Amino acid sequence: MSLSNNNSNRVAIIGASGYGGLQLMRLLSDHPHFKVTFLGGNKTAGNKWHQIAPFIKSSEDLTVRKADPEDIAEHADFALLSLPNGLSSQLTPELIKRNIRIVDLSADYRYRSLYQWKQVYVKESTKYIRNDDSLCREATYGIPEWNEGDIRKSKLVACPGCFPTASLLPLMPFLKQGLVENEGLIIDAKSGTSGGGREPKEHLLLSECSESIAPYSVLGHRHTSEIEQQATLVSGTPIQLQFTPHLVPMVRGLLSTVYARLRDPGLTAEDCKTVLEAFYRSHSTVEILPVGIYPSTKWARYTNKALLSLQVDKRNGRLILVSVIDNLIKGQAGQAIQNLNIMAGFSHELGLPLTTFYP
């Protein structure tokens, strides 16, 4: 239970009309302690919430306002930024100056240096002028099951991407223990169309993506370097890996399959399962499935839970890790609120769904 005063748990959602913002509003509408007191937007400024999303209840029919830092600071203690890459950086420094604690859902502060971000987000770096390298160094990478202590005291948490979340959760325990080789790591991941956001895009049209599955950004996907950065930090040695995402014709859900070679070929699947269980025993947001049971994305849909499974191929000494999440919940908004819970002193799972509706 939190030591926080309920009066200091006011939350601003900036970018409320995108998929991330909609999920945040939906989840916080049932939260026992946080209260949404400010909605910020650009295109939707001036509209009442019920005009934007009549299908999501709100205790107060707030009007969406321009994201003015002074206005936000007057109405909120925390800010959840669900903005396009680059845009968060234009608002964050001013909010930090006003003692607003931030969870940023974009990639703006996931890298430990501004230079790294500019190397990956080239287009955005030419559009938005940034001089906040110190904030990049100070920001906490928000995988709650791994960085709880830093998140608790952080003023700026960078929420991981959906692909990094699903890929790193099963992989990091083995890198941390030095149980897998650093070379030859392969991640094959598949995600639904909502991962592309709410803005219209040709390749996300029903007639384009229905009844089809396709890889994209086979080389140089932006999440590759994000995964590599965290894998390197955990293992203590530089890591380069192969990451290939695929678009599948479903709305939500993400499946990641990670291939790694075991240093000790004598390890069994049960041995490896014990490794995962040891790391996540105290976390209800991660569930380890029995050996031989492999999760479906539908099992995690609408939840803030990651389902992990594994197998060992004794023929080649390879460890196969399988992870599924809801890309909009555990891969985005739910994880953001999980971080927010920690920052406010609440339990990880407070106000978050952990059981799916099936089918």
From Swiss-Prot:
User: By its UniProt entry, which PROSITE patterns does this protein fall under?
Assistant: ARGC
Give the first-level EC class, as a single word: oxidoreductase
Pfam families given in the database record? Semialdhyde_dh, Semialdhyde_dhC_1
Question: Which keywords label this protein?
Answer: Amino-acid biosynthesis, Arginine biosynthesis, Cytoplasm, NADP, Oxidoreductase
What SUPFAM superfamilies does this protein map onto? Answer: Glyceraldehyde-3-phosphate dehydrogenase-like, C-terminal domain, NAD(P)-binding Rossmann-fold domains
Q: Record's InterPro entries? A: AGPR_AS, AGPR_type-1, NAD(P)-bd_dom_sf, NAGSA_dehydrogenase, Semialdehyde_DH_NAD-bd
Any one GO CC term of the record: cytoplasm
Listed under GO biological process in this entry are: L-arginine biosynthetic process
Question: What EC number(s) are associated with this protein in UniProt?
Answer: 1.2.1.38
Grouped into one coarse class, the protein's main location is: cytoplasm
**Subcellular location per the Swiss-Prot or TrEMBL entry:** Cytoplasm
What are this entry's molecular-function GO terms?
A: N-acetyl-gamma-glutamyl-phosphate reductase activity; NAD binding; NADP+ binding
Q: Which residues form the active site?
A: 162
Pathway recorded for this protein: Amino-acid biosynthesis; L-arginine biosynthesis; N(2)-acetyl-L-ornithine from L-glutamate: step 3/4
Cross-referenced CDD domains: AGPR_1_C (cd23934), AGPR_1_N (cd17895)
Does Secreted show up as a keyword for this record?
A: no
Reaction catalysed by this enzyme = N-acetyl-L-glutamate 5-semialdehyde + phosphate + NADP(+) = N-acetyl-L-glutamyl 5-phosphate + NADPH + H(+)
HAMAP family named in the record: ArgC_type1 (MF_00150)
The protein's job, in short, is: Catalyzes the NADPH-dependent reduction of N-acetyl-5-glutamyl phosphate to yield N-acetyl-L-glutamate 5-semialdehyde.
Assigned protein family:
Belongs to the NAGSA dehydrogenase family. Type 1 subfamily.
What PANTHER family does the annotation carry?
A: N-ACETYL-GAMMA-GLUTAMYL-PHOSPHATE REDUCTASE, CHLOROPLASTIC-RELATED (PTHR32338:SF10), N-ACETYL-GAMMA-GLUTAMYL-PHOSPHATE REDUCTASE, CHLOROPLASTIC-RELATED-RELATED (PTHR32338)
- The name this protein carries in UniProt is N-acetyl-gamma-glutamyl-phosphate reductase
Which source organism does the UniProt entry give? Prochlorococcus marinus (strain MIT 9211)
Q: What is the lineage of its organism?
A: Bacteria, Bacillati, Cyanobacteriota, Cyanophyceae, Synechococcales
Q: What gene is this protein a product of?
A: argC
